[in-house]
Amino acid sequence: MLLRAALAGFVLASLTLPVQAETIRIAIGTQDATINCAAGGLLIRELGLLDKYLPHDGKYKDATYDVEWKNFTSGAPLTNEMVAGKLDFGAMADFPGAFNGVAFETAGKHSLFISVLSGSIKGSGNGIVVPSSSTVQSLSELKGKSISVPFASTAHGMLLRAVAVEGWDPLKDVNIIAQAPEIAGSALQANKIDAHADFVPYAELFPNRGFARKIYDGSQSNSPTFHGALVDETYARQYTEVVVAYLRAGIEANQLLAAEPEKYSELIEKVTGIEAEVNYLFHGPLGVQTREMTWKPEYRQAVGTAIDTLKLLKKADRGLDLNSFIDDQYIRAAFKASGLDYTEQLANYVQLPLNANDAISGKPITDFTRVAEIWVKGEPKVRHYASAESAFSALDSLKKEGKSIRAIYAQASDSGIKLLADQAWFATDAKGRLSAFLLKGQAQQYAKAKGGKVLDFTDASAKSIASR
């Protein structure tokens, strides 16, 4: 009788043991080099933001947290460790994210896509580059050539769509080969590949390092792309407040990037080795992508497209129920806890705005179609100019003063994305005003319509100096 009572007491005690007494693992897989994931990993880790939001009340009153971080160069190995139960969270793009969901389903489990981190509803971020010595100026010139790409990546999806738009057979009219970005960089430098398609940040990083030239931007395919955060569903149901805490940390990281993009671009460089001027292309105002945490319809569409393409590539043998795989309840809760309006942000499609005065005139910049910027070495802030003419004139003066230049940016007149100005093409209108474009063909089309001329960076700079 006493034994039975003792056992009953033990069972009762075990059933009422507070959850808060346990040690809760928070294992997060990041892709540090995929710099548009910074608000979902690198910055949270480096700035210790997660600790600020982890719950310490209710069932978590006496809980302790074991936070683990692991960095990956792509989404596939990250997914493998999530499925194996070694990671709870992961940050990756739409294609590997879709594969993550399929891999979990295949293993009899479920993962959830809980937040967007950064993206473009048009497709910017993915791109195609050629060796800097190549004469190729557009994708149409690559018929019959070899194009490498990380297989089954978001860039692979972009490449297949771009090939389809050209009317090509991807198995006959172009030779698509699998190649990771770290291998592709060497291949481009050695002219061993005709072109390379890749995801963030390589279509900007390789040109910035001088051995490649961008000839196609993902926005030309008009196919949404994004990177986001996933979590193991079982973990999310058990530790809902921890998931919300992770997303609140991401929201703060996002706000910090918006407020001081140069400062945090420098931090990203310190951690990854990817130059701050490339990081600023994405995280600065009017950037290549928009840091975004809400589930816009276009991003939901991107996941569906990714699943269909993965099935076509025979990398997935099943579909996914997007309504259950994409779960926005956690990011909605994080927005509410952070005092933000999710519905309002869901309807907001504007790029991170530029609130700046022209560095020469001091007047507020109100027309962003011809904006240019200069990052002077040793200066903590980027200088902003209302036009390329003003920037190029200032550039000449800065060089005469002995200043070194980290980067010069120009805003593409058609797509609105930020470009490395020394890689861009320029066209004048009838009044001689400069507009920037990624492609020579785009500049030629504009010049023809406006009665102007096409100029490369060197000629555009010389024209601006001569006109002042």
Question: In which residue ranges do the predicted regions lie?
Answer:
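Sec/Tat signal peptide C-region and signal peptidase I cleavage site
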Residues: 15-21
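Short, glycine-/small- and polar/acidic-enriched structural segments
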Residues: 22-169, 175-178, 194, 223
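Secondary-structure end/capping motifs
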Residues: 34-35, 238-317
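A bilobed periplasmic-binding-protein/Venus flytrap-type ligand-binding module shared by bacterial periplasmic
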Residues: 44, 125-135, 225-241, 427-429
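Ligand-binding clefts/hinges and TM-proximal coupling segments of bilobed small-molecule sensing domains
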Residues: 63, 146, 150-162, 166, ...
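Pocket-lining segment of extracytoplasmic ligand-binding domains
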Residues: 105, 177, 182-271, 389, ...
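Conserved C-terminal helix/tail region of periplasmic/extracytoplasmic solute-binding proteins
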Residues: 310-355
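Short cysteine-rich clusters marking metal-coordination/redox-active sites
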Residues: 358-361
